[in-house]
Swiss-Prot record:
Role played: Component of the large ribosomal subunit. The ribosome is a large ribonucleoprotein complex responsible for the synthesis of proteins in the cell.
Listed name of the protein: Large ribosomal subunit protein eL22
Lineage: superkingdom: Eukaryota
UniProtKB keywords: Cytoplasm, Ribonucleoprotein, Ribosomal protein
Entries under InterPro entries matching the protein: Ribosomal_eL22, Ribosomal_eL22_sf
GO CC entries: cytoplasm; ribonucleoprotein complex; ribosome
Gene that this sequence comes from: rpl22
Localization, UniProt: Cytoplasm
Assembly information from the UniProt record: Component of the large ribosomal subunit.
Amino acid sequence: MAPVKKQGGKKKKQILKFTLDCTHPVEDGIMDAANFEQFLQERIKVNGKSGNLGNGVVSIERXXSKISVNSEVPFSKRYLKYLTKKYLKKNNLRDWLRVVANTKESYELRYFQINQDEEEIHMTS
C-alpha cells in the first residue's frame, strides 16, 4: 500500500518588522530622520527594483526619531544595516556613528566611544 500524503495547510503571511533607533543623532541635530526615511524609500529593493517598495509589500513608518520597516516578503535585517551604513557614509557621519543591534528586531545608531585618556598616553610616549 502506498503512503498517504497529508495535505499541508497554507502558510501564514509572515510580517517582518524591524526598527531603527536614531534618537541620539537626531537630538544632537547631526541627522534628519525624515531625510533618512526618504533615503530608505528610494533605496530599498523589492524584486530587484528600487524605489517602488513592491506596491505596499514593504512599508516604512517614522515616529519621532524611530523608523520602522514592515515587510510581507523575505527581508534581511542585514540589508537594513547595509543601507543605514550607506546613508551614514553619504552624509559623512560614518566616522562618528555606528549601527548596533540592540535586540533581535532592531538597530540603534550609537556614537563611537573614544577614550581621551588612552590617546593622550600614546601621544606622550
